[in-house]
């Protein structure tokens, strides 16, 4: 799957309405790093529709978001128009422009699977302040719904068979993978619950990378996928909102 597969209005608009679990992630960062006051400047690489940039703004006075997709950056600029604390521009993760004032923190949410690691780390080193932090994190929907074995069966035996995951690099970085100017700190994994109503869950699943791959290959249309989702899930999402479980990880990497 190419990075440019994310370059579509449909996906960009869908990203705006993703669950804002990034806030919980940032709260965990504050706890783990004993942050007592806001940082000055933060960079969010691979910012998507800006939800991760919004989370970074919780701990920074000013934030910059970059993404390889012009469609994503266009949505970001629309969402945060008129707010001088935000800046966005199109760039590869490996080609961030060196700012006048270097960043205290760089966040990378759900994007290191797609980068050239060595080039990315070299670029981050150039834009980070001394003792700055590279905070890499991700979270994803799992096959778990509170109180529902039917959902687990659907996820494993229907969804993943119809929409297999596209190939990606899912290696867990270690100190040996880092360039000499970085030190690997704590790496944690955790779960986060989130309540969905039926319609919102369908729309959320419509922007998963394996669903995007199926649509972009031409083997199914967007309307066909949405109809399949609704029919196959209707007996699972009965009544009130359902609590789905997300899994995630945080990696704290410090510049020496």
Q: Model-derived features: where do they sit?
A:
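A short glycine-rich, Lys/Arg-flanked "PGG" loop and its adjoining helix->strand segment in the class I
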Residues: 119-130
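Conserved Class I S-adenosyl-L-methionine
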Residues: 173, 177-256
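Conserved catalytic/acceptor-binding region of the Class I
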Residues: 131-196
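A short SAM/SAH-binding and catalytic strip from SAM-dependent methyltransferases
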Residues: 105-118
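Conserved class I S-adenosyl-L-methionine
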Residues: 1-37
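Conserved acidic residues
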Residues: 40, 61, 104
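Class I SAM-dependent methyltransferase SAM/SAH-binding core
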Residues: 43, 49-95
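A short acidic, Gly/Pro-enriched loop at the edge of an enzyme's catalytic core
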Residues: 97-106
């Amino acid at each position: 799957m190419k990075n440019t597969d994310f370059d579509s209005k449909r996906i960009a608009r869908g990203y705006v309405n993703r669950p804002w679990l990034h806030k919980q992630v940032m709260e965990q960062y504050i706890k783990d790093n004993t942050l007592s006051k806001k940082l000055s400047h933060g960079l969010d690489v691979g910012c998507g529709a800006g939800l991760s940039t919004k989370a970074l703004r919780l701990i920074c006075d000013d934030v910059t978001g970059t993404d390889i997709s012009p469609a994503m950056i266009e949505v970001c600029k629309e969402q945060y128009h008129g707010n001088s604390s935000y800046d966005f521009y199109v760039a590869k993760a490996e080609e961030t422009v060196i700012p006048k004032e270097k960043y205290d923190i760089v966040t990378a949410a759900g994007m290191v699977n797609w980068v050239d690691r060595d080039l990315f780390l070299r670029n981050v080193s150039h834009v980070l302040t001394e003792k700055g932090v590279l905070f890499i994190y991700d979270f994803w929907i799992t096959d778990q719904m509170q109180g529902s074995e039917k959902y687990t069966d659907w996820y494993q035996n229907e969804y993943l068979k119809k929409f297999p995951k596209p190939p990606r690099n899912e290696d867990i970085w270690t100190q040996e993978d880092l360039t000499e100017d970085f030190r690997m700190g704590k790496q944690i994994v955790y779960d986060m619950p989130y309540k969905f109503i039926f319609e919102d869950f369908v729309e959320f699943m419509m922007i998963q990378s394996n669903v995007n791959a199926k649509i972009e290959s031409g083997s199914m249309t967007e309307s066909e996928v949405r109809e399949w989702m609704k029919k196959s899930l209707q007996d699972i999402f009965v009544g009130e909102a359902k609590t789905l479980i997300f899994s995630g990880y945080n990696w704290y990497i410090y510049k020496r």
